[in-house]
Amino acid sequence: MSEADQKPVIIHTDGACSGNPGPGGWGAILKFGDVEKELKGGEPHTTNNRMELLAAISALEALTRPCSVDLYTDSQYVKNGIGSWIHNWKRNGWKTADKKPVKNVDLWQRLDAALKTHSIRWHWVKGHAGHAENERADQLARDGLTENRMKSRVK
């Protein structure tokens, strides 16, 4: 069966941050046919952009074999980074047009590695606009933020 014949894995991602920077969380929903998996996590001191990236990375890294993927994000940062900026960053040695180091380069490089493994079609959706899966991913991200905040208080 060719990749074009494969049913795609559908992924919805979101990130959340309380303060920016501050504690953050990320969430992702992966669907393949009738199978669905939810992922979430967080960090004690991060930014919203890092959480948006980590949601996409974590979802793609959870796939156990090369897949055809439709990935939905409400992040303009992720959309523009993957659709436009990353090509020039790589060509410029991970520097911006202003010759400054790319922010979040560690995560962009992980996402770039996932691009080599999977065939990904990127889709942008407006956040908080009633897209059911985006709202679920947002709730997972907020849950990840809350759980991480509680863990950091217990330590």
From Swiss-Prot:
SUPFAM superfamilies: Ribonuclease H-like. Monomer. The keyword Cytoplasm applies. It holds the Pfam family RNase_H. Its EC number is 3.1.26.4. One of its GO terms (molecular function) is RNA-DNA hybrid ribonuclease activity. It is an enzyme of class 3 (hydrolase). One of its GO terms (cellular component) is cytoplasm. Its cofactor is Mg(2+). One of its GO terms (biological process) is DNA replication, removal of RNA primer. Gene3D superfamilies: Ribonuclease H-like superfamily/Ribonuclease H. It is found in: Cytoplasm. This is Ribonuclease H. Keywords: Cytoplasm, Endonuclease, Hydrolase, Magnesium, Metal-binding, Nuclease. It comes from the Bacteria. Transmembrane segments: none annotated.
